[in-house]
Swiss-Prot record:
Keywords: Acyltransferase, Cytoplasm, Transferase. It catalyses: N-terminal L-lysyl-[protein] + L-leucyl-tRNA(Leu) = N-terminal L-leucyl-L-lysyl-[protein] + tRNA(Leu) + H(+); N-terminal L-arginyl-[protein] + L-leucyl-tRNA(Leu) = N-terminal L-leucyl-L-arginyl-[protein] + tRNA(Leu) + H(+); L-phenylalanyl-tRNA(Phe) + an N-terminal L-alpha-aminoacyl-[protein] = an N-terminal L-phenylalanyl-L-alpha-aminoacyl-[protein] + tRNA(Phe). It is an enzyme of class 2 (transferase). The gene is aat. Its EC number is 2.3.2.6. This is Leucyl/phenylalanyl-tRNA--protein transferase. It is found in: Cytoplasm. GO terms for molecular function: leucyl-tRNA--protein transferase activity. Belongs to the L/F-transferase family. InterPro entries: Acyl_CoA_acyltransferase, Leu/Phe-tRNA_Trfase, Leu/Phe-tRNA_Trfase_C, Leu/Phe-tRNA_Trfase_N. One of its GO terms (cellular component) is cytoplasm.
Amino acid sequence: MLTWLQRNTLDFPPLEKAMREPNGLLAAGGDLSADRLIQAYRHGCFPWFSEGQPILWWSPDPRTVLFPDELHVSRSLGKLLRKQHYQVTFDRDFAAVISACAAPRAYADGTWISEAMQRAYLQLHQRGYAHSVEVWDQGVLVGGLYGLAMGQLFFGESMFSRADNASKFGFATLVERLKAWGFVLIDCQMPTEHLHSLGARSISRPEFANYLKHHLDLPSRAIWVS
């Protein structure tokens, strides 16, 4: 039975209560307050829902992740990185990045990043949890991504690209920076061909929970401001 969250508590059900079909649906309801979102990521779940649906919280099994040491850089991407074809900044314009991620895609109907979601993650950014990566081409924003950093873990949320390999360029740059900062895992949530091409793979929900247990509260060397 699906658990409905109450507004007067931030508690989530145990991850093992998540449904098998649809894979990982853990709870519904609640709100998108900053405190609830922080608790959700610490617990191992994330919000994902379409317009007209209640807020839905997910913890899929298996979980798609990328270990920084396993980043795969294709020949074409490596060439762009070596030439520093694009310029990358961090936390320069979070609002522009999440707005671009929310824009309709040619291959999808609508967007799950509603205005309410944008406001919620902007609050997380203002509190120092959510961060953006901007990819520029001669001063024009052509790609980027955003997510949350907690301890030695980064929780990726969404990315966009307006130029060839721009989002991959930003992601690869971020991964190398996270590696230098002592991060051990990047949560990619759901599998996609795009992520797998970069080296992402699946681990079990218990494995993912173990990383949360051991790395959420450890310090990192992150310095986000560019």
